[in-house]
A protein has these predicted regions:
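Aromatic/hydrophobic beta-strand junction motif of beta-rich domains
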Residues: 391-397, 405-409
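Noncatalytic carbohydrate-binding groove/subsite architecture in carbohydrate-active enzymes
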Residues: 102-103, 107, 145-294
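Substrate-binding cleft and catalytic face of glycoside hydrolase catalytic domains
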Residues: 42-187, 224, 328
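Aromatic-rich peripheral "rim/lid" segments of glycoside hydrolase catalytic domains that contact
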Residues: 61, 129, 133-134, 144, ...
Length: 493
């Protein structure tokens, strides 16, 4: 009873609506009953929404080929008491690469879609534009391309939908959790979520736009492997459910101080695709061979229950949609549903139902409060080794950073060293510069004099306004003095 009272109090104190739970599954659209049975099952579990895909084909800019199916399935979902969310995006990517797709045409199509379906109050604009399966090209040898190309489509979509009804919710991007950031990769040339958001923010600021791009950010926190526990995330600059703070930081780095809100001033996260695939060996209703690592049904149930509870306790999360309410029969498809292909329920069904019911009463623990980092994340004390004529310095950080490492003549205070090393030209010293790769040690070597000050300026790759200065005296013998660390904060101009 006490726990229930505490949960209710916390829910009231936060002032933020609890996360909605639902499923992202197009099977209902093609079912004989237009999905009516599945939607009733979703509602019985406590789910509140159904996410349905609606693709825009650039070569048929006014077309809506699935209109008859959409009419029936939207009505069936609404009849079951579910809110309907349309997930919209240009497709196929070859028409984007060929220049057939135009932002204004996409916006006009979205406006008509919103007018035709007034009961649909939320639109996701974009689907994994950081992946080549949905947007091409991604990268050149010199620049990130997909974010700057996608930005005008998101802007056009936002403006068009808001022109129909300013109260409609526009959720942007549909970000994939992973990308390799390698234009020379043999396959799947893609962009990490952190770097995609950085590039989208750079495009937005350069565009001069004075309106938002989105009310919320859609993110797909799939695990790197279905065998991963919920709390196992990705290394920077990728991100999973365990790394939502990294996504929030990336949004803040990209948009803080602009007309586009961050999670500090209203933007929320919509986890519109997430799922842990399960072993189906020996089960009826499946064909083909499995092509990815999978987990067992008990582990899936534990992960899903923990996912629901954790999302409910994060005030920045607006929605969670499990990808696949019922399994695909072909094993090369997706098998993460609450129902197996033969229609029998998995243990995850009861686990999700119980967790939704529990969280409907509020968060049983104090909800986490996220605040942006103002310095380079995870910047560590440098390792310093003296040679006869050189100083070797090893640096590491939890994110990518640009380093400037200087040996300044004489003794310096932390403040004076920071001032000198931040200047374009350093008088009275020698410097080296380079990139510090996240979670790896990067070595710099400088020629030294008898007595100097080692000064290091680390600047976050995704936000020049986040910098950390490290200072250490260097004499004939290295003096083991405490490291002095301070951060300087400057928003983007």
């Amino acid at each position: 009873m006490l726990a229930g009272m505490l949960a209710a109090v916390l829910a009231c104190v936060s002032g933020v609506p609890a996360a909605d739970f639902g499923a992202n599954d197009d099977a209902g659209k093609y079912a004989d009953d237009a999905g009516a049975a599945s939607y009733r099952e979703m509602a019985s579990l406590g789910m509140r929404e159904a996410l349905i895909t609606v693709r825009w084909r650039p070569s048929d800019p006014l077309g809506l080929a699935e209109r008859p199916l959409l009419d029936l399935t939207v009505a069936a979902a609404r009849s079951a008491g579910l809110a309907v969310v349309f997930a919209t995006y240009p497709y196929p990517p070859r028409e984007i690469a060929d220049g057939v797709a135009r932002p204004d045409a996409f916006g006009a199509w979205l406006a008509e879609l919103a007018r035709q379906y007034p009961d649909v109050r939320e639109f996701v604009v974009g689907n994994e534009p950081n992946q080549p399966a949905f947007w091409r090209p991604q990268l050149s040898r010199r620049a990130q391309l997909s974010a700057r190309a996608f930005g005008p489509f998101l802007a056009a979509g936002y403006d068009a939908i808001k022109a129909v009804d300013p109260d409609l919710i526009v959720v942007g991007v549909g970000l994939s959790p992973r990308g390799n950031d390698r234009p020379d990769a043999r396959s799947n040339v893609s962009t990490s979520p952190v770097r995609f958001l950085a590039a989208l923010g750079a495009w937005y600021r350069a565009s001069g736009r004075d309106r938002p791009l989105m009310d919320g950010l859609s993110f797909h926190p799939y695990p790197n492997s279905a065998t991963d526990a919920l709390d196992r995330g990705y290394p920077w600059p990728n991100a999973g459910f365990a790394n939502l703070d990294r996504v929030k930081q990336a949004v803040w780095d990209a948009f803080a101080g602009s007309a586009q809100p961050t999670t500090l001033d209203g933007l929320r996260l919509y986890l519109d695709e997430v799922g842990w695939q399960v072993d189906t060996a020996g089960r009826d209703g499946y064909t083909g061979d499995e092509n990815v690592p999978v987990t067992d049904e008990r582990s899936q149930a534990e992960v899903y229950a923990a996912l629901v509870r954790a999302a409910a306790c994060d005030p920045d999360v607006a929605a969670v949609n499990l990808f696949g309410f019922r399994d695909d029969a072909l094993r090369t498809g997706f098998q993460a549903g609450l129902y197996r292909a033969d229609g029998s329920p998995r243990p995850a069904l009861e686990a999700v139902q119980s967790a939704i019911a529990e969280t409907a009463r509020g968060c049983a623990e104090v909800a986490p409060v996220w605040r942006p980092a103002r310095a380079v994340l995870g910047a560590q004390r440098p390792t310093v080794a003296l040679g006869r004529r050189t100083v070797s310095v090893e640096l590491t950080a939890a994110e990518g950073a640009v380093a400037r490492v200087c040996l300044l003549d004489g003794r310096h205070t932390q403040a004076s060293a920071r001032l000198v090393v931040s200047a374009r030209r350093v008088a009275g010293g020698t410097c080296a510069a380079g990139v510090v790769t996240a979670n790896r040690h990067t070595r710099f070597r400088l020629v030294r004099a008898t007595e100097q000050t080692l000064a290091v300026l680390l600047t976050a790759q995704t936000n020049p306004g986040r910098a950390t200065t490290l200072v250490r005296p260097v004499a004939t013998c290295l003096r083991e003095l405490p490291l002095l660390c301070r951060s300087s904060v400057r928003r983007h101009p």
